[in-house]
UniProtKB/Swiss-Prot annotation:
Pfam families: GreA_GreB, GreA_GreB_N
SUPFAM superfamilies xref list: FKBP-like, GreA transcript cleavage protein, N-terminal domain
Keyword flag Coiled coil: no
PANTHER family xref list: TRANSCRIPTION ELONGATION FACTOR GREA (PTHR30437:SF4)
Superkingdom assignment: Bacteria
Coiled-coil segments on the chain, per record: none
GO biological process assignments: DNA-templated transcription elongation; regulation of DNA-templated transcription elongation
Name listed for the protein in its UniProt record: Transcription elongation factor GreA
NCBIfam families assigned: greA, PRK00226.1-2, PRK00226.1-4, PRK00226.1-5
Family that this chain belongs to: Belongs to the GreA/GreB family.
Transmembrane listed as a keyword: no
Length: 164
């Protein structure tokens, strides 16, 4: 598996979720299964089957998060030069087809939130922009077709991961 770039915030978020699953959720679901098992016939015990399904989900999530952590590449974007688009860059782009401006910050996949302008480094937009410079024209394949953009600015600003 490839390295997964992320900020320290993203890494800490994943580690906290993994800890919660291992130390709280997993023991709780084991108790729920034991309680449900005590309710009799397991073939028709909906509570037992629901708890077992939840346990499978928790265990799968633990495996996924453990893989992400094992492959994490924590990057401090504040120390990178942002003369070209890279991880942690905030990019202001102009859609040349409709003259609309957009601003995006490139983050790790676990940190992305397009509604806040935080796009994953693996997204089609980010892939098209990474390595480009201010003033470059870029064609980006979007869901509604290809659009042409101009990079107006590239800079670093502290990333706001406000979780509210």
């Amino acid at each position: 598996m490839n390295k997964e770039p992320m900020s320290m915030h993203g890494y800490n978020k994943i580690c906290a979720e993994l800890k919660q699953l291992k130390e709280v959720e997993r023991p709780n679901i084991v108790k729920e299964i034991d309680i449900a098992r005590g309710h009799g016939d397991l073939k028709e015990n909906a509570e037992y089957h629901a708890a077992k399904e939840k346990q499978r989900f928790i265990e799968a999530r633990i495996v996924d998060l453990s893989e992400i952590i094992a492959n994490a590449q924590v990057i401090d974007p504040s120390v990178l030069a942002h003369n070209k688009v890279s991880f942690g860059s905030t990019i202001k782009i102009l859609n040349l087809d409709n003259d609309k401006e957009f601003s995006y910050t490139i983050v790790g996949s676990v940190e992305s939130d397009p509604s806040k302008g935080l796009i994953s480094f693996g997204s089609p937009i980010a892939k098209s922009l990474i390595g480009k410079s201010k003033g470059d024209a870029v064609s980006i394949q979007l869901p509604n077709g290809e659009s042409d953009f101009e990079i107006l600015d590239i800079y670093y600003k502290e990333i706001c991961f406000d979780e509210n």
